[in-house]
């Protein structure tokens, strides 16, 4: 019997001896960070990178904030997790609907699965539109999970 968690057909260690920090810089390029580092503009990020991992992922297509971030936290493409854009058009009403509601998600996030296995989860996002998607499946009543955005941190 494995002590790993299976999340969307991928295995992850079920317990960590170290803290995991995931930083998604949507719309950035690694060259921007390299130049900032050379100019000593990112000392804290440089320390995190030096003491851990620095992994580059390819963007999901379509290359928009919501599908890219959800692909990162589910390990799946939009066709599997369900978030195919930032908005979709509803012909019946003629309106654009923002895809920031978890009801559109068809795959759990790594955060949800680790939370359900007993882990504590802290999520911080710059954009509030991602908060409900990233925090999907977490309960904020038992002090094991927190999720907020810098955009609406008050």
Q: Each predicted region: which residue ranges?
A:
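Glycine-/proline-rich flexible loop or hinge segments
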Residues: 27-30, 50-56, 65-68, 87-99
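A structural signal for well-ordered alpha-helical segments within the folded catalytic domains
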Residues: 18-19, 39-43, 67, 105-112
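Extracellular/periplasmic catalytic domains that process cell-envelope and extracellular macromolecules
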Residues: 13-16, 65, 115-116
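Short, structured active-site-proximal loop/turn typified by the sulfatase FGly-forming signature C/S-X-P-X-R
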Residues: 34-78, 122
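Solvent-exposed loop/turn segments at secondary-structure junctions
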Residues: 27-30, 62-64, 121, 128-131
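Active-site-proximal N-terminal segment of extracellular/periplasmic enzymes that hydrolyze or transfer
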Residues: 2-53
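A residue-level signal for conserved active-site and pocket-lining positions in enzyme catalytic cores
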Residues: 26, 72, 114
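His/Asp/Glu-rich, glycine-adjacent segments
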Residues: 77-154
